[in-house]
Each structure stands twice: as C-alpha cells, then as structure tokens.
Amino acid sequence: MGSRLNFKSFVDGVSEQQPTVGTSLPLTRQNSVFSLTFDEFQNSWGGGIGKDFGSMNMDELLKNIWTAEESHSMMGNNTSYTNISNGNSGNTVINGGGNNIGGLAVGVGGESGGFFTGGSLQRQGSLTLPRTISQKRVDDVWKELMKEDDIGNGVVNGGTSGIPQRQQTLGEMTLEEFLVRAGVVREEPQPVESVTNFNGGFYGFGSNGGLGTASNGFVANQPQDLSGNGVAVRQDLLTAQTQPLQMQQPQMVQQPQMVQQPQQLIQTQERPFPKQTTIAFSNTVDVVNRSQPATQCQEVKPSILGIHNHPMNNNLLQAVDFKTGVTVAAVSPGSQMSPDLTPKSALDASLSPVPYMFGRVRKTGAVLEKVIERRQKRMIKNRESAARSRARKQAYTMELEAEIAQLKELNEELQKKQVEIMEKQKNQLLEPLRQPWGMGCKRQCLRRTLTGPW
C-alpha cells in the first residue's frame, strides 16, 4: 500500500458505483461467542467444565465466557480477510479474525487505509460486574428477569389477557441478551461528532467521500452535508425554528423516532452491544404545553449568563439551561384563564416578592375568652395545690415541735433522777467513815497463848 490519498474520490453527491454493504454488516458478530445461546454454548464449550452454567455464579460465568472467547479468537488468527472495495472511491471494508473479536475495520483512501473503526467487543476489563449480582447464581438472575417481564406484561396488558404466553427459557437466550438485561454491560452514548461527517481531515470536501453518509450503510440517522464545508446542516431543524411553538414540540419528539426505525433493526443485529443513538437538538428548543397559546412562552437566546428577564405570571415557569439554551414552560393545571383576560396589574403583582406568611387563622373573641378562662382555672388550681402543700408542711413542722418539747421534758426528769441516785450512793459510802472508834463496838484485848510444851 502506498502513502498517497486519492482526492478524486472526495466528490459532492452520491456516487452511483458505491455498492450497498448491508449484506456484510453481520460480519461483526459471526466470530463472537456472545451470539450463541446458552444451550449452544453449553454444547460447544461446556464439555470440559463438567458443570451446568445455570448453577454457576456470575463471576464464574464471565470467566468461562472470556476463556472461550480468547480460545475462539486464537483459532481465528489464520482466517483470511474478505475485502469489499469500491473501485473509484477507495472505501474498503475488511473483515478478519485475530484478537479483534468479530472486528470490523474500515479503510478510507485510494491506496492507504488512513482510518479504521473497530466494532469489536472490548476485553474483560470493560465489563463491570455489579457487586449485587457477582455472587448470584445464573438461575437466580434468570428468575428475577422473568419476574420483571411478568410484571411488565401485566402492566401492559392490564391483566385482561387470559391466553397464557410461552416464556423464553434460559437455554434459548443468547449470552449477549442475558448480560445486557442482567446489567453487566453498561452502554455508553456515542458522540454525534465522531460519526457525523468524515471528509478525510480536509476542509472544503463534502460528506459523500467519507463514512458519514447514509448511502454506504455504515452510519445511520446522520444529516447530509449541504454546505460543502464539512459541517452537517439539519434542514428540518431550520424549518422547525420558524414554526409555531405548539407545532414544534411533536416534530422534535417524533422526528428522531421516524429516522431511527429503518436502521434500528440492522444496528441491533450487527453489534454485540449496540450503542445508544444521540439525538441532536438545535441551539434553542422551546417546549410548551399544548393547552396554552404560544404567546405565553418567549424564545430565550443563549447569552453570556444564559438568563434573560421575561414577563412571568403566576401560571408560567421558565427554566433556562446554561449549555444548550433550552426553555421549558410549565403551566399550572389549576388555572385555565386566558392570558388575554389576565389584567396587567396581576402581572405586575406577580413580580413582587411573596410575603412571608403562614396563613394563621385570626382568633375570635370567644376563643380568646376560653383561653383566658382556661388559664385562670389553671392558676387557681396551682394556688390551691400550693396552699395545701404549705398546710401539710406547717402541720408536719408543728408535730415535730411538739415531739421535741416532750423529749426535752423527759430529759429533764431523767437528769433529776440521776442526780438523786448519785447522791444516795455517795452518802452510803461516807457513813462508815464518820463513826468514831469505841463507840458502838467492843474493844478487843490481847491474850497470851501457849507456844511451847512447858
């Protein structure tokens, strides 16, 4: 391959020699095991495991899937490449095996492939397994999905359908569908600018020479380049700005759905994990309730701060987005008065600050009298209870004083008796000492005793 680019292929207008590659789009999934059902995967890769996939937890299932995917990709390294090329434009579609699982590479240029986009599935690090289901068994996750489907079918049918519908079994579901519904795969929105228009990196060329066209079947729901300078122009959005606001809302909501319907089925079949389609909006979008006239909501242009002062009444609420300049007008359902009948004073009054009121009910005279009477009764009761407590305290004090007086008298009597008893004992001890010798007693005489035999 050379190093030159074929600039002749970048022409405005759709080339008649470009073939439709709609038949080669399923090549992105023919080398992936994610398109197999559980039964096919069990029959093909479950022989060496010796364990049913339904009894495994989600961690083991992912490990087995990635092991099978790696072995499958290693077997596909020698797969020959199939080229679908355009003679004049130089657009080449290459489908091959290798580590790029179900890869799809697209080359642009006459002799050199200067741009390649991979539609392959990323490796194991891209799949984030939630902690809530990492240790759950596959059968348990499948039962939860079936319960959600039953609840959804009951809500849609309203419980009126009496015909039992056949439920899909786990063996009939593909690995891709199971992982998406179980929440293992997180789809990220793809930016519009990455696939909107590709002109080879040169200014002044149209969008027909690149990949950002709907004619070659690679990019769906992309606008055509009408300016010739690589900038996508949405003619429908330009015309929608001049229409009334009531007619603009259904157009902005329904138009992306009408464009997505022809290509949505093809995209869901060609990719293992389809990306979400990003809807491009205009610079300023006004969404108004259909029940109100368009004169109530004024268009808000994005400014430095993104906020403009607009007249507002009690039934209109405007919110301005700082990035896209989106104006949302919400109308209160409680008031259906026409804006023509609304007086100007009401609009001026709505701009004034709302007083800080809690809506207290004014009390009447009877209520006040009842409150005063209740307070007086409470005061009387408090006084009576205080008087009773004081009387009890006084009586208790008097009883204590009487007991103290009695104890004092008894103490005095006991002290007197003690003094008398002590005097008597003292007198009894002193009486023998007061009597003289010879008086009242006989004098003893000495006598000679025999002390020997003579």
Curated annotation (Swiss-Prot):
<dbReference type="Pfam" id="PF00170">
    <property type="entry name" value="bZIP_1"/>
</dbReference>
<feature type="region of interest" description="Leucine-zipper">
    <location>
        <begin position="400"/>
        <end position="414"/>
    </location>
</feature>
<dbReference type="GO" id="GO:0009737">
    <property type="term" value="P:response to abscisic acid"/>
</dbReference>
<dbReference type="GO" id="GO:0003700">
    <property type="term" value="F:DNA-binding transcription factor activity"/>
</dbReference>
<dbReference type="InterPro" id="IPR046347">
    <property type="entry name" value="bZIP_sf"/>
</dbReference>
<dbReference type="InterPro" id="IPR043452">
    <property type="entry name" value="BZIP46-like"/>
</dbReference>
<dbReference type="GO" id="GO:0000976">
    <property type="term" value="F:transcription cis-regulatory region binding"/>
</dbReference>
<keyword id="KW-0804">Transcription</keyword>
<keyword id="KW-0539">Nucleus</keyword>
<dbReference type="GO" id="GO:0045893">
    <property type="term" value="P:positive regulation of DNA-templated transcription"/>
</dbReference>
<feature type="modified residue" description="Phosphothreonine">
    <location>
        <position position="169"/>
    </location>
</feature>
<dbReference type="GO" id="GO:0009651">
    <property type="term" value="P:response to salt stress"/>
</dbReference>
<dbReference type="GO" id="GO:0003677">
    <property type="term" value="F:DNA binding"/>
</dbReference>
<dbReference type="GO" id="GO:0043565">
    <property type="term" value="F:sequence-specific DNA binding"/>
</dbReference>
<dbReference type="GO" id="GO:0005634">
    <property type="term" value="C:nucleus"/>
</dbReference>
<keyword id="KW-0010">Activator</keyword>
<comment type="function">
    <text>Binds to the ABA-responsive element (ABRE). Mediates stress-responsive ABA signaling.</text>
</comment>
<feature type="region of interest" description="Basic motif">
    <location>
        <begin position="374"/>
        <end position="393"/>
    </location>
</feature>
<dbReference type="GO" id="GO:0009738">
    <property type="term" value="P:abscisic acid-activated signaling pathway"/>
</dbReference>
<protein>
    <recommendedName>
        <fullName>ABSCISIC ACID-INSENSITIVE 5-like protein 6</fullName>
    </recommendedName>
</protein>
<keyword id="KW-0938">Abscisic acid signaling pathway</keyword>
<dbReference type="InterPro" id="IPR004827">
    <property type="entry name" value="bZIP"/>
</dbReference>
<feature type="modified residue" description="Phosphoserine">
    <location>
        <position position="32"/>
    </location>
</feature>
<feature type="modified residue" description="Phosphoserine">
    <location>
        <position position="55"/>
    </location>
</feature>
<dbReference type="GO" id="GO:0009414">
    <property type="term" value="P:response to water deprivation"/>
</dbReference>
<comment type="subunit">
    <text>DNA-binding heterodimer. Interacts with ABI3 and the AFP proteins AFP1, AFP2, AFP3 and AFP4.</text>
</comment>
<keyword id="KW-0597">Phosphoprotein</keyword>
<keyword id="KW-0238">DNA-binding</keyword>
<feature type="modified residue" description="Phosphoserine">
    <location>
        <position position="126"/>
    </location>
</feature>
<comment type="similarity">
    <text>Belongs to the bZIP family. ABI5 subfamily.</text>
</comment>
<feature type="domain" description="bZIP">
    <location>
        <begin position="372"/>
        <end position="435"/>
    </location>
</feature>
<keyword id="KW-0805">Transcription regulation</keyword>
